[in-house]
């Protein structure tokens, strides 16, 4: 038994963690966009 075949098997937990991190990053980016937009609107309303 070599290390070749076992490397091709992806750990489901790793995949889940990867997806979670991506989702969190996406949400954070969206929140930042919303905050920037809110600040812009606020400054224009003054």
UniProtKB/Swiss-Prot annotation:
Molecular function terms from GO: hormone activity
InterPro entries reported in the protein's UniProt record: Corticotropin-releasing_fac_CS, CRF
GO CC list: extracellular region
UniProt keyword list: Amidation, Hormone, Secreted
Cystine residue pairs: none
SMART domains per record: CRF (SM00039)
Alphabetized Pfam families for the sequence: CRF (PF00473)
Sequence positions bearing Isoleucine amide: 46
Record's subcellular location: Secreted
Origin superkingdom: Eukaryota
Family: Belongs to the sauvagine/corticotropin-releasing factor/urotensin I family.
UniProt function note: Regulation of fluid secretion. Stimulates primary urine secretion by Malpighian tubules and causes a dose-dependent stimulation of cAMP levels in the tubules. Has a greater effect on the transport of Na(+) then K(+) ions. In vitro, has synergistic effects with the smaller diuretic hormone DH(31) which co-occurs with it.
The protein, known as: Diuretic hormone class 1
Organism, as annotated: Diploptera punctata
């Amino acid at each position: 038994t070599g290390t070749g075949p076992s490397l091709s098997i992806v750990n489901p937990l790793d995949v889940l963690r990867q997806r979670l991190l991506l989702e969190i990053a996406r949400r954070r980016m969206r929140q930042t966009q919303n905050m920037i937009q809110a600040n812009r609107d606020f400054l224009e309303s003054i």
